[in-house]
Amino acid sequence: MATSTSTEAKSASWWNYFFLYDGSKVKEEGDPTRAGICYFYPSQTLLDQQELLCGQIAGVVRCVSDISDSPPTLVRLRKLKFAIKVDGDYLWVLGCAVELPDVSCKRFLDQLVGFFNFYNGPVSLAYENCSQEELSTEWDTFIEQILKNTSDLHKIFNSLWNLDQTKVEPLLLLKAARILQTCQRSPHILAGCILYKGLIVSTQLPPSLTAKVLLHRTAPQEQRLPTGEDAPQEHGAALPPNVQIIPVFVTKEEAISLHEFPVEQMTRSLASPAGLQDGSAQHHPKGGSTSALKENATGHVESMAWTTPDPTSPDEACPDGRKENGCLSGHDLESIRPAGLHNSARGEVLGLSSSLGKELVFLQEELDLSEIHIPEAQEVEMASGHFAFLHVPVPDGRAPYCKASLSASSSLEPTPPEDTAISSLRPPSAPEMLTQHGAQEQLEDHPGHSSQAPIPRADPLPRRTRRPLLLPRLDPGQRGNKLPTGEQGLDEDVDGVCESHAAPGLECSSGSANCQGAGPSADGISSRLTPAESCMGLVRMNLYTHCVKGLVLSLLAEEPLLGDSAAIEEVYHSSLASLNGLEVHLKETLPRDEAASTSSTYNFTHYDRIQSLLMANLPQVATPQDRRFLQAVSLMHSEFAQLPALYEMTVRNASTAVYACCNPIQETYFQQLAPAARSSGFPNPQDGAFSLSGKAKQKLLKHGVNLL
């Protein structure tokens, strides 16, 4: 036992402690500290030592919080540093070696918390639904996988485990990207990634989600989440071979980013209702100008199923600014804050787990109505009246905005049924919107024109847009009603407190907001969020995984996928042949002996800050000179993180020098292994360290790194 413990401690010398502490179980003076310890790593630590460390850290956090009104995020001791994260009564703590950069230590802790929440949901509910022994086993699996796959460079940058793309044929990378794009055209699929032997081949996910999906292969087969295995059998969706679908939880910011794909990828949801087959080809392509829609003008506009046809004036259609006969008032739209802005919880609304939610992603754009005057609206009818646009002139000469209105089906009545809920907003006088330039603009009321939302102008780059999402909100007087057929599943965020995935009759104890609402589908999917889950800022989705030997296709999808056997079959058959071919080619083309590396006269490391990917030429077994290079990289990476204005530096000792440069999207480090001429140790124009910048720019070009 002593031998195994010392071996484990040696292999994880940089990862000393990790524990999860529940402060709600230690309230009184006589409550034992051990009662609040949910998990402690390493488990071989004596219980008395666990209590001592947990009690001291919890006391420090409480003391600092009382003094500064904010909990600490990092506590530095003489030989250890502790990254700290407070989540209500729960305390997450990761103890690392002092040599590890502060930013990496905090990122590792955030990553651990993200892993747990992704597969288990909110920590409070997870420990209510599962035993502590089961969750401890899962924690052990997570930590073991992290320590096994984290190299010296990965622990400095906390980067993802990616395949070295310089060793893969570009056509194979293109094929992997095409597989993901093909899967995206299937119903309910949002985005995904492809892994080979635990390494990233291609991904559409943001780095935070990609990191969580990377550990899925090591997760237990028997998922302990409710409806994880039973849901497919409940709904008659027999899973194909080597396919698994489990419920997962993403943050609201991650959910927004998953729905912010270009228009071309979202138009497939508009062609799903009957009668749209012929009109689906008329949607403007990605990158095209929205002004081309003027060619389809016919002088007629169809609104949503509950709107009145062709009102003669805004005042007649919407008297007193209220909704009558389905007309929407001037406060019917509000933009959701982009990911990372937490100053307004009331402005966050998500339409998830439904096709309507995906259609509404169309309606994204920053809009300043204070300078827009609409003397005469141009009316356009498209796709047999199922999607119509109103063109609005923009005074600054940019491409015109297009206002859009949806029609679920031409056969629906123009007036709403009794149980139809017409989405609207709370009535703030001037809701704020965040524009591309970072300035906040006031959205003024324009009665008669607020029932439509703008769609984005053509995006020059085929990437996810970063514009706010415009989604309707549920009218306070009609919270308990249901959406019409075809729009069920649009989960509303009532008063911005929590998302409504709960069955009618359930309430969320957060102020006066009720968490009632329509379920994600007509048949009532059993894996919907409970009020407690939704109020904790998590959104439930499905993770579809298809394993083909060493290749894994992982897709994040909306909740209805779990009960849609046709969609599952479509995803499976559309990707099966391509996945088999890709697996064979990767197996044949990748180097078999990774340890055999060609000798090089220099070391380099290139870190992509946006994708959190790393590229380097270091050998598997580091030499003493490589160790000095890693020490220099760790030091300079910390300096770049603490000093954003710093963009270039060189560090040296008596035997070697390391050059580094960075910008907002990347960091690059370079070391010449040959002994530098005239390395005198003090500034000298003839010192070899001053020529490292030019050598780095020249030699790294062949690796695809451009420092010019």
UniProtKB/Swiss-Prot annotation:
UniProt keyword annotations, A-Z: Albinism, Guanine-nucleotide releasing factor, Hermansky-Pudlak syndrome, Phosphoprotein
GO biological process, any: lysosome organization
Annotated stretches, region: Disordered: 269-331, 407-490
Listed Pfam families: Intu_longin_1 (PF19031), Intu_longin_3 (PF19033)
Molecular function per GO: guanyl-nucleotide exchange factor activity; protein dimerization activity; protein homodimerization activity; small GTPase binding
Biased composition (Basic and acidic residues): 319-331
GO terms under cellular component: BLOC-3 complex; cytoplasm; cytoplasmic vesicle; cytosol; lysosomal membrane; lysosome; melanosome; membrane
Entry annotated with the keyword Phosphoprotein: yes
PTM annotation (Phosphoserine): residues: S355
InterPro entries assigned: CCZ1/INTU/HSP4_longin_1, CCZ1/INTU/HSP4_longin_3, HPS4
Functional note: Component of the BLOC-3 complex, a complex that acts as a guanine exchange factor (GEF) for RAB32 and RAB38, promotes the exchange of GDP to GTP, converting them from an inactive GDP-bound form into an active GTP-bound form. The BLOC-3 complex plays an important role in the control of melanin production and melanosome biogenesis and promotes the membrane localization of RAB32 and RAB38.
PANTHER family for the chain: BLOC-3 COMPLEX MEMBER HPS4 (PTHR14407:SF9), HERMANSKY-PUDLAK SYNDROME 4 PROTEIN LIGHT-EAR PROTEIN-RELATED (PTHR14407)
Implicated disorder: Hermansky-Pudlak syndrome 4: A form of Hermansky-Pudlak syndrome, a genetically heterogeneous autosomal recessive disorder characterized by oculocutaneous albinism, bleeding due to platelet storage pool deficiency, and lysosomal storage defects. This syndrome results from defects of diverse cytoplasmic organelles including melanosomes, platelet dense granules and lysosomes. Ceroid storage in the lungs is associated with pulmonary fibrosis, a common cause of premature death in individuals with HPS.
Assembly mode: Component of the biogenesis of lysosome-related organelles complex-3 (or BLOC-3), a heterodimer of HPS1 and HPS4. HPS4 and the BLOC-3 complex interact with the GTP-bound form of RAB9A and RAB9B but not with the GDP-bound form of RAB9A and RAB9B. The BLOC-3 complex does not interact with RAB5A, RAB7A and RAB27A.
Protein name: BLOC-3 complex member HPS4
